[in-house]
UniProtKB/Swiss-Prot annotation:
Pathway: Lipid metabolism; fatty acid biosynthesis. PROSITE patterns: CARRIER, PHOSPHOPANTETHEINE. This is Acyl carrier protein. 4'-phosphopantetheine is transferred from CoA to a specific serine of apo-ACP by AcpS. This modification is essential for activity because fatty acids are bound in thioester linkage to the sulfhydryl of the prosthetic group. The lineage of its organism: Bacteria, Pseudomonadati, Pseudomonadota, Alphaproteobacteria, Hyphomicrobiales.
Length: 79
C-alpha cells in the first residue's frame, strides 16, 4: 500500500473504529465498514484536512471505497 494509502487507512480506522485488517482497497465505507452518510461526510473532511486539498461534492459522491479515496488523493493531495 502506498504512503497515501496508509494515511487513508489510518484515518478510516480512527474515524470508523474498525479493525485495520478490514480496511482494504475494495472495502466499501458503507457496506463493508458500517459507515453512515454522516460518517462519509466526516471522512471526506478528514481527508481534506490531512492531505491539504478540497474534495468537491461531485467527486466525494464517487468515493465509495478505500481504494477510491486513495486514487483520488494520489492525484490531488498537496501534502
Amino acid at each position: 500500500m502506498s504512503e497515501i494509502g496508509e494515511r487513508v487507512k489510518k484515518i478510516v480506522v480512527e474515524h470508523l473504529g474498525v479493525e485495520p485488517e478490514k480496511v482494504v482497497d475494495s472495502a466499501s465505507f458503507i457496506d463493508d465498514l458500517g459507515a453512515d452518510s454522516l460518517d462519509t461526510v466526516e471522512l471526506v473532511m478528514a481527508f481534506e484536512e490531512e492531505f491539504g486539498c478540497e474534495i468537491p461534492d461531485d467527486a466525494a459522491e464517487t468515493i465509495l471505497t478505500v481504494g477510491d479515496a486513495t486514487k483520488f488523493l494520489e492525484k490531488n493531495a498537496k501534502s
